[in-house]
């Protein structure tokens, strides 16, 4: 009898795990790590992002537009504070030298609920020292002025502007909402191939 109960329990547990996997898979593509936290830290260093909107001359914290999953809601209306063209960000780094990258995933949701991932290229302007590799892996890598890929800065500008002229809004239909995940992560120097799964830096 005990054996039968245990077997039944195993079947129930497997079913629950399968259900969770199905539900979670619709959102799994939207994160580059198992955690939705914006910060990634190790004992020897810590990195984080300061995300805000530049409304004219006023710097407005983006926290007001951040949901429980760490995603920022962006507006397509130029008159709104959280217009995607107003998005700005800095990256902070503390501790030992590290290789740093920022992963950016955009979620476009149509009026009928259909979700498209990174459907429209968003032409942010990145500060000097950053390499835009989003076409390949949705990430922007810190290259540094010497292209060494080693970050020793305390605070570095990341998103500094938006190229309105090259933004193709023709594919955007009425009722679309946009959210973005900005996730900073870092690895010890010389360990990025194992952790990030790349043989060399994208600019090499």
What are these regions (language model features)?
Residues 1-51:
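Gram-positive cell-envelope targeting signals
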